[in-house]
Structure formats: C-alpha cells, structure tokens
UniProtKB/Swiss-Prot annotation:
Monomer and homodimer. Part of the essential Sec protein translocation apparatus which comprises SecA, SecYEG and auxiliary proteins SecDF-YajC and YidC. The gene is secA. One of its GO terms (cellular component) is cell envelope Sec protein transport complex. This is Protein translocase subunit SecA. It is a peripheral membrane protein. One of its GO terms (molecular function) is ATP binding. It catalyses: ATP + H2O + cellular proteinSide 1 = ADP + phosphate + cellular proteinSide 2.
Length: 862
C-alpha cells in the first residue's frame, strides 16, 4: 500500500526514465524544420559532416544524437513515406543506451531500429541486427535499406540458405548486417576453426540489436549452439534400455520417510525421473547385470534414465513429431519444428528407440557456445520486444540490461477479460468452439492460441465437424506463416496457431472489423511463462485498435495440474461448480498467475545455474580462441614460441628421468629411447656428464633446437613458418576438442560431489582449472612431438593449408549443428575416460588413480 502511494506521487522508475527521454525528444523535434527544408544532396552532406566528426574523434555518438535522429526521421519520410513518432524516438534512444525497449505489437520496432543502427554505424565498426528467422531478417533489411542506402550505408543479410563463406563475408563487411541468432553464433564458431584470418567472415563484435530479445536471450538461453562430429560408440544400449523401460511400472511420489511404490517416480516440476530401489533391482534382473551402477554398467544406467524420460516426460506431437521416420524437436515456445536440432545427453537416441526408428549415432562436441555468452561478447548489446518486464530481473542480473517500457503512440483499447476455468479439458474444448461459433456468426475474426501441435489438431478436427472454415498455423515455413497471419484480421477469419507462431508480423484490421469489436484472441491454455501469454494477447489491439482477449482453462491443464490445481479445485468445489459450468474470478486468475510465477522462478534459477557452469568453460574458450587468433596473425613469432616449448619440454622430460635431486643418477636408457621416439633425435650420455640438473635441461633443449633446425633447413623460411603455424593450430584444435569432451564428462558427474558435502560448482571450477592446465601442456608438448616427427615432400608443403581446411569442412558437414540442452548436471556417465581425466565417480582423483586402477565401485545415479 505504501509503495503504491509513493508510485502515485512520484511515478515509477520507468516513468521517470521515460520523462528524461521526452526532454530530448523535444530537442530533436525542434530540428525537424531545419532538415525538411534541405534538398536530398544537402541533407546527405549534413549527415556526411557528422559522420566525419565521429570518424575523426572530434565528437562521439551522444554529441550528434539529436541531429542524426532528426536526419534519419527526415530520410524515412522521403524514402519510405514513414515518419518516426515521438515514442519511436524514445525507443531509439533506449536502444542506443544499450537497454531493452519494450514496445507493444504494432508500434513499429523495425522502423525504430533504424535510429540507433545509423547512429552506431557511423564509426565504421559495423552494426548487427538479429531476428528470430530468415524471413524477418530478409524482410526487415529490404524494407529499411532505403533509409540506409540514402545515407551512404551498405546493408547485408546473413541467411541459412547461403552456402558459401563468400556470401557471409560480403554480408558482414557491410556497414549494417541483418541475420538470425543461429547464423551469427555458428559463424563465430566456424571462424574459430579457420586456418587463416582471410578466411574468417565476421568482423569485431561492436553493437548488436536483438529483435524479439526475450525469445532469444531467455527462451533459447538453455539451448547451446553446437558444432559436432560423429563418434564410434555403440547404440545397442539404447534398444536394450528402451525394452527395459517399457516393463517398468510408474509409482506415485510420496513425502519422506515413506517410500514410493513402483519402479520409478516422475518429477514433473523438475522434469526428472527417480528410480526406486525396487526399480533398480528389476532393471538389474532385466539387463542381466549384478550392479547397474558399477563402472562397467554406468553408461547403461544413463541410457535407462533417458529411456524412462523419453517414455514419461516427452510426448509425441507435443515435444517432438515424427517426419519421414525421424524424430524432430518441436520448439516449446514457438510450436515450430526445429529441423537440424537434436536433444543432447543421449535423449534423442532414447526417443528414436521409443518410436522404433533408425537410431542416429551420438556426436562429439567440436565447438559450442550459448547465446548468453555469445551476445555478451559485443561492446554494446540492446534489444526490442513487446514483452520484457516480467523478465526484467533476469535481463538485469544475467546481461546487465535495463528494461524500459515505451508508451504506446495511441492508448490501448483492447479488453483483457478474466480467465474462464472449467473442470475438464473436454468441457473447455466445447466452450471454446461455442465462443468461436458466436464470433464467426457475426464475422468477427478469431485467433485461437494453442500450446502444442497436438492441441491445434484437436481444435482443427472439432471445427471441421462444425463446418467452420479456418487456417491451422504450425508450419515450419516462416514466409507462408507470415502470409496466413496477415490475413487473420479479415472478416470471418478463424486461425488456429501455436502461441508464438507468426511472431514479428502484424495483424491489421479495417474499419468494418473495428466496428465488430476488433480481433478476438482466445487462449486455450496458460503457458508456463506470463510473457508468452502477454504476447498472444498483444496480437490484438495494435495502434489503438479495439480487440478482445480471453483465456479458457481447465483443471486438467498441465500448469494447473502440476503447480496450482488443488487450491483452484477447492474454490470450484466450494462454489458448487457443476459439469459444463465455468468460474470467472479475479482470485482464480491471480492464483493462476502465482502458479506461473513459481514456474518462471524455477526456470530463472535453472538458467542462472547453467550459466554459472558455462561461464567457467566460456573463460577457457575465450582464452583458447584469443591465442588461436594470435597464431593466425602473420606477425606472430611462432618460432620463438616453438623454442619456448622445446625448453619446457626438455625440462619436463629431464625431470621425469632424473632419479635424485643432485642429478647424478639419470635413467639415460629410457631417456634416450623417449627422445628418439618422440623427437627422432639421438642423444649421447657423454653430452650430459658433470652437469647440474638445470644445465642438463638446457643441454637437452640445445640439442633439440639444433636437431629441429637441421630437419627444417631445406625449407624456405616463409614455408617453414606456415607449416609451423598450421601444425600448431591442428594440435590446438584437436586438444581443445578432447578438452571439451573431458569437460562434458566432468559436468555430467559433478553433481555427485553433493553427496560428499561438497559444493559441485566449486568442485567443477577446481577440476576444470586442472583440466585446462593439462590442455595447455598438451598443446605445448604435442606440437613439439608433431613438428619433430612429421615428414614432407614439396607437394604436401604447398597443399598443407588446403588439406587442413578440407578436414575441417568434413567435420563441419557431418556436424549436428544445434543442441537442445537438457539440464543433466547430476548424472554420472562413465564413458571411455582418458587416464588423466577426473574420475566421474566424484572422488576428486584422476581416473588412473581411482576406477581406472582399482576396478568398479558401487555408485549412485543422482
């Protein structure tokens, strides 16, 4: 109450921020008359003057903002016959300040972006504009290019349909580049697998505006971009695990100390499976093993866990569909099919076994990055969306982005009615159809939002029976989708769409539809996120148009059933609600919103938790990529680096074979054998007589230096440096891939440390640091071994770089390019663990000192 009083007197923080921006709008408006009186050439000359001041450092972007915004507004009027509204100027300033502009549907976000894009492109460092699909990227670039071209800027578009690096490089070399988040991210990963700077396509990460920022930075935050290659692991275990999973009985969860019945319990809130003691015994009998959680059977245990998830947490036509005997993921937020993406951790293989289709082989990560860490690389990050305030805390904590709600140009007239709640889904379905029939009878257009493809089909079949013409929108073709959505506001139109389909395309209505009350939005289920519901509502009431929105719910809906159904059911029982009747109450609507807040909080904590782990790997990634870029630089002294590595290698090897501190006792036989094997170099015991430990290390280093120089003496210096650089890069890349595999193993088993009263995150940081030190040493020493052992003829020398690139291309072509991450930090997966890796059992010891030496120990799958 006290806070509400303060807000009424002083306004909210958002109100105060907007008020500050309005003061600057007045200054921009005062310049409008000056620029509208100029000819085209004079206007261009004025802009060129400001651009020169930016490039020379005489002024910065903030100094010229008023004039540049006024010029862009005037350019929009002349080229597109579109004038930026005052509130759009505010949106532009918010984006330029590196914040998120929350602007309602129909407020012209595409036009708003031109203001900060032009202002920040003046430095010549490039501006990226990110959209959610190729159609929107192409459309926005084409629509706004008239403004950019008038002011002398080039515009490029990065599309998934473009197959060559040349096309991508041309797009990135433009002043302004439009594209999707996936393409920007994958190009970054591919660039860091190239063998020369000239082959890279991206420039520096200067300024980026992310359209539909909530979809990309929140909804997609747990989905890493992955470039991967095939492995040689057997897939038979998934078939066995699937057969066992089908024979296990589901039990009901109970509160401790009571023990659940059945073989396993489904934890729907956390989307996890808990196997009971009886279930473990049954699985061991069916598999024919004594201990399911021994080292030898741990992969089988993991495959069983994934099989149980596949059967109990993932529904066909909800979470995935079958197309041409392939399991294709359905994006939970858009309802679109996610071609090319696969669930990780063996879950996709489990789904393929469940559906009895060909099981695709597992893959090994070659390079990966999350959107969270990719977009945080930019010098300045900004975003636009119609719905961001509900996630303002996450934007602030994860991305350091403030959310500013921009006032609408014309007040919203849409009526948002309270939810109607029914006892069963069938009652709800019938009520929705009756409401559609009423609206359709008078010609009012209706947009029906569903939570899944399966639900879309239910309403489609019911409308067919009622002989009501309609469109079903859950296609994967964004362009076709956009055309259908554009017609959703026409008289008599009935459109069924998954909640987010067609996003980025406005639904326009005419005067006849306005007289009928505007577009009618019917939500058939509350999403776990209030933001998705608000996006559905926002399809109606654009630019001050009338409209109606209402959600129809049932106690059998997942959200109410899992997170809040008991309280609402008791209210309905007290009110004596009969079959077919509904309840409409602000109390119930608030209870539903509270359930959504619970889920949002769970998801936020999950994303935050994952980021804490990913930040560890991200720092290592940045270090390796930074060093890799140094190696690509022609001015980098690779020969000095090799000499340094030879010295470290020599010291390391000598220490392994010196048997006492004085250095008087050295195992020369084994030392000579090692140097001959690894460096193709003969050494004599006489060379080391009467030398101290340090002198022996230096002597070995000198011998190896001379041997290396002699070996490479027949090559031209330029050729030699190129060979050294490429071979060093190959060693680095191979070591990095192996390191990513080790990190995957570490992350998979780290949750078990909690059973030993240790913080898994702290343990993960310690172990990953040790792994990184091993990685650095492996790069140093393996490069030395390779350089000493490699033999070339002249043709191979000339084609070395081409061959390296061809091998990379093969890897990229075989890659599984998108990973849909399931959060399985608590599951130990004992694969073919390298001897020096941390043992997955969680002991903290190296594998060779634990299970690799002493044989299997009993473990628990968390």
């Amino acid at each position: 109450m006290f806070l509400n009083t303060l807000k009424a007197v002083f306004g909210t923080k958002n109100d105060r921020e907007v008020k500050k921006y309005f003061k600057r709008v007045a200054q921009i408006n005062a310049l409008e008359g000056n620029y509208q009186n100029l000819s085209d050439d004079e206007l261009k000359a004025e802009f060129a003057k400001f651009k020169e001041q930016i490039l020379s450092g005489e002024k910065n972007e903030n100094d010229v903002l008023n004039d540049v915004f006024a010029i862009v507004r005037e350019t929009g009027k002349r080229t597109l016959n579109m004038r930026h509204f005052d509130v759009q100027l505010i949106g532009g300033m918010v984006l330029h300040d590196g914040k998120i502009a929350e602007m309602k549907t129909g407020e012209g976000k595409t036009l708003v972006a031109t203001l900060p894009v032009v202002l920040n492109a003046m430095s010549g460092k490039g501006v990226h504009v990110v959209t959610v699909n190729d159609y929107l990227a192409k459309r926005d670039a084409e629509q706004m290019s008239a403004i950019y071209n008038f002011l002398g800027f080039s515009v490029g578009v990065v599309l998934s349909s473009q197959n060559s690096d040349i096309e991508h490089k041309q797009a990135y070399d433009c002043d302004i580049t439009y594209g999707t988040n996936n393409e920007f991210g994958f190009d970054y990963l591919r660039d860091n697998m190239k063998f020369s700077k000239a082959e890279k396509v991206q420039r520096e990460h200067n300024f980026v505006i992310v359209d539909e920022v909530d979809s990309i930075l929140i909804d997609e935050a747990r989905t890493p971009l992955i470039i991967s290659g095939p492995t040689n692991r057997t897939l038979d275990g998934y078939i066995k695990a699937n057969e066992v999973a089908k024979q296990m009985q589901k039990g009901e969860a109970v509160l401790p100390p009571a023990k659940p019945e059945g073989d396993f319990v489904v934890d729907e809130k956390n989307r996890n499976i808990l196997i009971t003691e009886a279930g473990i015994a049954k699985a061991e009998k069916l598999f024919g093993v004594e201990n399911l959680y021994s080292l030898d059977n741990a992969i089988l245990a993991h495959q069983l866990d994934q099989a149980l998830k596949a059967h109990n947490l993932f529904e066909k036509d909800v979470h995935y569909v079958l197309r041409n005997n392939e399991v294709i993921i359905v994006d939970e937020f858009t309802g679109r099919l996610s071609e090319g993406r696969r669930f990780s951790e063996g879950l996709h293989q489990a789904l393929e076994a469940k559906e009895n289709v060909k099981i695709q082989e597992e893959s090994q990560t070659l390079a990966d990055i999350t959107f969270q860490n990719y977009f945080r690389m930019y010098n300045k990050l900004a975003g636009m969306t119609g719905t961001a305030q509900t996630e303002a805390t996450e934007f602030s904590q994860i991305y350091s982005l403030d959310v500013i709600s921009i006032p609408t140009n014309i007040p919203i007239k849409r009526q948002d009615k309270d939810d109607l709640i029914y006892k069963t889904q069938n009652e709800k379905f019938k009520a929705v159809i009756e409401e559609i029939k009423k609206a359709n009878a008078k010609g009012q257009p209706v947009l029906v939002g569903t939570a899944s493809i399966e639900r879309s089909e239910v309403f489609h079949n019911m409308l067919v029976k009622e002989k009501i013409p309609h469109h079903v929108l859950n296609a994967k073709n964004h362009e076709q989708e956009a055309l259908i959505i554009q017609d959703a506001g026409k008289k008599g139109a009935v459109t069924i769409a998954t909640n987010m389909a067609g996003r980025g395309v406005d639904i326009k209505i005419d005067d006849e539809i306005r007289a009928l009350g505007g577009l009618y939005i019917i939500g058939t289920e509350r999403h776990e996120s209030r933001r998705i519901d608000n996006q559905l509502r926002g399809r109606a009431g654009r630019q001050g148009d009338p409209g109606i929105s209402r959600f129809y719910l049932s106690l059998e809906d997942n959200l109410l059933r899992i997170f809040g159904g008991d309280r609402i059911k008791s209210i309905m029982d007290r009110l004596g609600i009969e079959e077919g009747e509904s309840i409409e109450s602000r109390i119930v609507t608030r209870a539903v919103e509270n359930a959504q807040k619970k889920v949002e909080s769970l998801h936020f904590e999950s994303r935050k938790h994952l980021l804490e782990y990913d930040d560890v790997a991200n720092e290592q990634r940045k270090t390796i990529y930074r060093y890799r870029n140094e190696l690509l630089d022609e001015n980098y002294d690779i020969r000095a680096k090799i000499s340094q590595n030879i010295a470290e290698y020599s010291a390391n090897v000598m220490n392994d074979y010196i048997l006492d501190e004085s250095g008087s006792n050295v195992n020369f036989e084994n030392l000579k054998a090692k140097i001959l094997y690894e460096c193709s170099t003969q050494i004599s015991e006489k060379d080391f007589e009467n030398l101290s430990v340090i002198e022996m290390q230096d002597k070995l280093s000198q011998i190896l230096e001379n041997s290396y120089n002699e070996k490479m003496s027949r090559l031209e210096i330029k050729e030699l440096r190129n060979i050294e650089r490429i071979l060093y890069l190959q060693v680095l890349d191979n070591a990095w891939r192996e390191h990513l595999y080790q990190m995957d193993i570490l992350k998979t088993g780290i949750g078990l440390r909690g059973y030993n009263q240790k913080d898994p995150l702290v343990e993960y940081k310690k172990e990953s640091y040790n792994l990184f030190l091993e990685l650095v040493n492996r790069i140093k020493f393996d490069s030395i071994k390779l350089l000493f052992s490699v033999q070339f003829n002249q043709e191979e020398v000339q084609n070395l770089e081409n061959k390296a690139n061809e091998e990379n291309e093969k890897l990229l072509q075989s890659s599984v390019e998108m990973g849909a991450s399931e959060d399985n930090l608590g599951e130990a997966e004992f694969k073919k663990v390298p001897r020096n890796a941390p043992c997955p059992c969680g002991s903290g010891k190296k594998f060779k000192e634990c299970h690799g030496k002493s044989g299997p120990k009993q473990g628990i799958l968390a």
